[in-house]
Amino acid sequence: MATVGVLLLCLCLCLFAPRLCSSKEEGPLAARTVLAVAVTMEGALRAEAATGGRSSTGDVQRLAVYASLETDSRLRVRITDADHPRWEVPQDIIPRPAPGDVLHDAPPASSAPLQGRVLSPAGSDLVLTVHASPFRFTVSRRSTGDTLFDTAPGLVFRDKYLEVTSALPAGRASLYGLGEHTKSSFRLRHNDSFTLWNADIGASYVDVNLYGSHPFYMDVRAPGTAHGVLLLSSNGMDVLYGGSYVTYKVIGGVLDFYFFAGPNPLAVVDQYTQLIARPAPMPYWSFGFHQCRYGYLNVSDLERVVARYAKARIPLEVMWTDIDYMDGFKDFTLDRVNFTAAELRPFVDRLHRNAQKYVLILDPGIRVDPIDATYGTFVRGMQQDIFLKRNGTNFVGNVWPGDVYFPDFMHPAAAEFWAREISLFRRTIPVDGLWIDMNEISNFYNPEPMNALDDPPYRINNDGTGRPINNKTVRPLAVHYGGVTEYEEHNLFGLLEARATGRGVLRDTGRRPFVLSRSTFVGSGRYTAYWTGDNAATWGDLRYSINTMLSFGLFGMPMIGADICGFNGNTTEELCGRWIQLGAFYPFSRDHSAIFTVRRELYLWPSVAASGRKALGLRYQLLPYFYTLMYEAHMTGAPIARPLFFSYPHDVATYGVDRQFLLGRGVLVSPVLEPGPTTVDAYFPAGRWYRLYDYSLAVATRTGKHVRLPAPADTVNVHLTGGTILPLQQSALTTSRARRTAFHLLVALAEDGTASGYLFLDDGDSPEYGRRSDWSMVRFNYKIPNNKGAIKVKSEVVHNSYAQSRTLVISKVVLMGHRSPAAPKKLTVHVNSAEVEASSSAGTRYQNAGGLGGVAHIGGLSLVVGEEFELKVAMSY
C-alpha cells in the first residue's frame, strides 16, 4: 500500500501541476538506504543515507542526516551532502544552534538493512522516526499519535535540484503561510503551487511570487491542534500543496527542516519566532496614521496636505515622501528646485514641533556617476569597494536614476557605509524613519544571454509563467562578498538591507528605529515593518489585504498594512471610505498612491473624511491596546492582527474565516469588502460580543453564530469579546496628544462574570523595550460571583518604573454586560475601601439594556495607573 500511495502522490503532482513534472532536472527518484546511525552525547541523531550505486541523474551519492530536538517543542532535521559543503543561510544572519558534525567515516552497508531509529526525548511531544530502507523520516505527535510530516521514499538531492514530499491527512489539514503571494484565500487552497523567489511584481497580481520569501507554514487540524514547519533555505523554490501532500522543489542549498510542536497557534508562533528572532519593537508614534503619495510636487504641496488634515480634524501622525524628493532619484540627495534643504528642513522642524514625524524612501541602487565627484555616496562607496560584483568588477544595474551599483550587504564594510550615509543625510534632514524599497533587488535591465545560473535545470514558476530567475532583478551570476553568488543569496538582500538600515538609524538617533521594507525573508521582523507593496485601487485588493496581513503575522512580522485606498489605478469615494474603515485597524495604517492617479487624501471627499474621523478616532482610543499588543508580539511573537482560529482553535468554522480578523484576543473587526452593501455578514465564535462604539451586547452565543450586521456607509463593525478588559485613551490628532489624556477601562464580562486585561507603558521609543528601560506593566482583573453582589475591579502593578514617575490616571470605568433585573436606583463606589462620589455630574450612570445586560459608567475617578487599586461598585435597587 505504501508503494501505491507514492504512485498516487506522483500522479497527483502531474495532473494538477504538469509544468512541475516537465523539468529536465526531474527523473527517476533515487532510492536511498541508511548505512549508519549514531546518537550523540547530546541526544542528537546522526545518520548517513546513500544510493545503491552510481546515479545517471546526478544525485548526490552520500547524504548526511542530522536530527536534534533543540527545545522541547522544536525539532530540526537537516539533510546535506556528506562529502561537499553546500550553501545555507549563514549563522550570523539567522543565529541558531549549529548542527553536529556529519559522518565522514561511516561503516559500509550490511546485507541486512538497519532498523528505523527513533528520536523521542522525554518531555517533548515530538517524535522523529528515521526509516532505513528506503530512507525516509516521519515526525509525529506523542500525545495523539498524529503524523505531522511523513516523507515519501525517493528524496531527490542533486546540485541544483532538491525534492521532498510529505503526506498530509486529507480532510484534516488546514495550511496557512508559504509566502509571499497575494491570495484570494488565507487558508491555502488544494492543488496550488507557491513559488518563493523575491520579485518586483505588483501585489495586485494574484497567485504569483512577490517581494518576500517565507518557507513556513502552520497546519491547524481539527479538533484544534496546530504545528509549524519551516524549510530554512534562501534558494528559490516551488512548493506544491495538494491537500493530501506537500512537495518542495528547491533549486539549491540544503534541506534544513524545523518542526514546531504547538499545540495551539499562539504556541507555534512563539516557538517559531524564538528561532528566527522576535519582532522588533515599534515606536509608539508608528501606530498613528501615515500619509504618502508618489507624486507630491514640492514642499508647499506637503505643507498643504498637513494643513488640510488639521483643518478636517483627521488625525495625521507621519508625513512621507516618495522618490520625488531626490535629485535625479539619487539616494541621500535633495531635489535642487522642489525639495531644497532650505524649504524641507523648516517643514520637518514644524512637524516635530507639532509632535508629528517625517519618513523618506531609499532604494538600494547607487547612481553610477564617475564624472560627478560631488555625489558623495557614490564616491565613498567606490572608495570602500562595497558594491556587488561580476567578473571582478562592479555589477551594473538600472533603476530610477539610471545605471547603478548595488551595495553588497554581505560585505563586512557595507553596513558601516550605509549607516554613515544615513547619518550624513540626517544632519540635513532629521528624518524619523526610513522606507527601503526596490530591494528584491529590482533591476530594469533586460536579461542578457543566459548561463546555467540564469536558467537552472529546474525552472521555478517565477512570475506565474516560469520566467527565468534573472527577470527584472540582479543576474544570479553576480557575486557577493566571500564568493557567494546572487543565485544563493538573492532572497536575503531585503533582510540584510533592513538590518543595516535599522542599526544605522539606531546608532544615529539613539532611539527605537522605524524601518519599512518591501522585500523580506525569514527573520525580517527583527528589523522592519512591512506593507503589502504595490496593490491596486480595487475591491479585490481591499479583500486580499486581510489575507496578506494575517499571513505576515504568522511569519513574525506583526507591523503590517496595505496602501489604504489602493496604490495603482484611480480609487473611488466608496472604495476609499470602506478602505479607511478597514485600514484604521491595520497595525500599520498608511494612505499611499501612485503618480498620475487621482489623489486620495482622506479629506478630499466629505464622506471619506467622516469615515476617517470615526474609524481613526476609534483607532487612537485603542492606541494603548495596539501598543500593548506590540509588547506581546516582541516578547512572544504573537501577531497583532490575528485570524479567529488563534483564539478559537477548536471551532472548525473559524479555519476559513478571512474577511474578519481579531486585534489581539479581544477586538473583532468585520469590515465591508464589496461595493453597495449597507450590511455585512460576520461570524461570531462562542461567547459574548459587545459593540465597541456604544458598549451594548450585540451577540451572545454558545456555539458560534453567523450574524448579518448593519454597516452604514460611515461605520465599520468592531466588537469586543466578553472576558476582556480594554484600556483606552481619548482620541486626538497626534499620538503624543492622545497619550496625555486620561485612561478609560472597558470591562466586558464573559458569561461566567469574569474579565481580564493588561497595559504596557513606556516612553514610546526607548531602544531597551520592556527590559532595562523605564517601563510599566499593569494587569486588571474583574470577577463577580454568579453576576450578583458587588462589582470588583482590581489592578496589579507588575512593573512600575514608568507609571510611578508620571501622573497617569484612569478617570472612567465602563462595566459591560452586567445582568440586572432593572436599572439600579443608586451606584455606590469605593476605591480601596474609601467611598467616592458617584453622581451623574461625575459621569456615573447606568444604561439598562434589558435582557442583554446593562452598562455601568463609573466616572469622576482618579485611579493612579502606577498604584494598585480595588474598585468596588454596589448597586441598590
From Swiss-Prot:
Signal peptide, first to last residue: 1-23
Pfam families, per database record: Gal_mutarotas_2, Glyco_hydro_31_2nd, Glyco_hydro_31_3rd
Protein name: Alpha-glucosidase
PROSITE patterns named in the record: GLYCOSYL_HYDROL_F31_1, GLYCOSYL_HYDROL_F31_2
Reaction equations catalysed: Hydrolysis of terminal, non-reducing (1->4)-linked alpha-D-glucose residues with release of alpha-D-glucose
Reported tissue expression: High levels seen in the aleurone and scutellum after germination, while low levels are found in developing seeds.
GO BP annotations, alphabetical order: polysaccharide catabolic process
Keyword field contains Ubl conjugation: no
Keywords annotated in UniProt: Glycoprotein, Glycosidase, Hydrolase, Signal
Glycosylation sites: 191, 298, 338, 391, 471, 570
Inducers of expression: By gibberellin A3 (GA).
InterPro entries: Gal_mutarotase_sf_dom (IPR011013), Glyco_hydro_31_AS (IPR030458), Glyco_hydro_31_C (IPR048395), Glyco_hydro_31_CS (IPR030459), Glyco_hydro_31_N_dom (IPR025887), Glyco_hydro_31_TIM (IPR000322), Glyco_hydro_b (IPR013780), Glycoside_hydrolase_SF (IPR017853)
Active site per database record: 437, 440, 534 (proton donor)
Family assignment from sequence similarity: Belongs to the glycosyl hydrolase 31 family.
GO terms for MF: alpha-1,4-glucosidase activity; carbohydrate binding
Disordered, as annotated region: 89-115
Positions in coiled-coil regions: none
Enzyme class, first EC level, given as a word: hydrolase
